[in-house]
Amino acid sequence: RVLSSTDGVTWESAALITSPDSDLRDAKITVTPQGELMLCGAEALHDRSQMSHRSLAWFSADGYHWSEKHIIGDPNFWLWRVTWHGDMAYGIGYDCGEQRSVRLYKSLDGRTFEPLVERLFGEGYPNETSIVFHGDTAYCLLRRDPYQGVSGTGLLGISQSPFTQWQWKDLGVQIGGPHMIWIPDGRLLAAVRLY
């Protein structure tokens, strides 16, 4: 369900997006350079004979009327969040199968995503992410769960344009639901769930 508010206090339903053959999860809204609302999420398929998850996007000019779904990214890679930087959309998808890795995608239109870095990180079980940009620098806050004896601590990644080479700093704590935003005074604000 998409909610809208004119004051941030009182909310009303603007739209309901459903799927007869999947469970829709973890919706996030961003705004494209053309001013469209872009709703991204994943579907957990009821029939998992071909794949278990797909990433999806819908578009709207007003928040009330939404396009049909667009399948984005690769099968079984969950694009956790899409972030626009200039005219390019970036998203990091995590493997829902056995590979236990994350992949960095880019898109010019938000409808067709191509891998920019096939294996962005692959130690432990990396999954949920938030990516922000400051000029030609990208920052990524990455959740990592314990897997095959590898630590489950979060990581902070830093990269310079064209964002194909990354350096990672271990944060020393397990995190969930990472998100980062730039606030008006120029500071970077990060929020996570601690375990």
Regions found by a protein language model. Give the residues of each.
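Beta-rich carbohydrate-recognition and catalytic domains
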Residues: 1-25, 30-195
